[in-house]
Design a protein with these regions (language model features):
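Conserved SAM-binding motif I beta-strand of class I
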Residues: 9-14
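Mobile active-site "lid"/loop adjacent to the S-adenosyl-L-methionine
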Residues: 41, 59-89
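Short, well-ordered secondary-structure micro-motifs
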Residues: 50-52, 72-74, 113-114
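Conserved dinucleotide-binding and phosphotransfer motif residues
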Residues: 6
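C-terminal catalytic and target-recognition region of SAM-dependent MTase-like enzymes
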Residues: 98-157
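S-adenosyl-L-methionine
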Residues: 16-62
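Short glycine-dipeptide loop
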Residues: 89, 94-101
């Protein structure tokens, strides 16, 4: 939403029709319904493959993939098994001078160090730049602590 509010053209892709509908509702509630956005219900990897064939390029990519999912034919998708290929594929649609790439992971199987390693070994050799990674956590008001629930990795020039 932030990028739409700044005037960026946004493409939102999710395999779940319900998630795309929810994102549209959030855009409307944020008074951003009139800003440019392509709302696409599709498998993200298949969408990226088509964008590669079309020659489409993006200055920034934000990924928030599920930890686990099933395709329409019952195929099982696990982030731990597919994250490397998904990032490698997505690198091909980044522009020649991209701004950043960010990915979140909500699985215990991908620590911040692992996420950073994957992003560093897939994007840095091709695009240069640097990475940073951190843990995603939920604050616990009763104790003041934080419950770890995933990792985020960001690449930028």
């Amino acid at each position: 939403m932030l990028f739409r509010s700044a005037g960026a053209s946004v493409t939102h892709v999710d395999a779940s029709k319900g998630m795309v509908a929810w994102a549209r509702e959030n855009a409307a509630a944020s008074e951003l319904a009139d800003r440019p956005c392509r709302w696409i219900v599709d498998d993200c990897a298949k969408f990226v493959q088509r964008e590669i064939r079309r020659g489409s390029r993006y200055d920034a990519v934000i990924m928030d993939p599920p930890s686990y999912g099933r395709g329409p034919g019952g195929e099982i998708w696990k982030l731990e098994d597919n994250v490397y290929d998904l990032i490698t594929l997505t690198e091909q649609v980044l522009s020649d001078d991209p701004l950043f790439f960010a990915i979140n992971s909500y699985t215990e199987g991908l620590s911040p160090a692992v996420m950073e390693y994957i992003v560093k070994t897939t994007l840095c050799p091709v695009k240069g730049g640097h990475t940073h990674c951190d843990e995603i956590g939920l604050p616990v008001s009763a104790t003041g602590g934080v419950v770890p629930c995933g990792a985020t990795a960001i690449w930028e020039k």
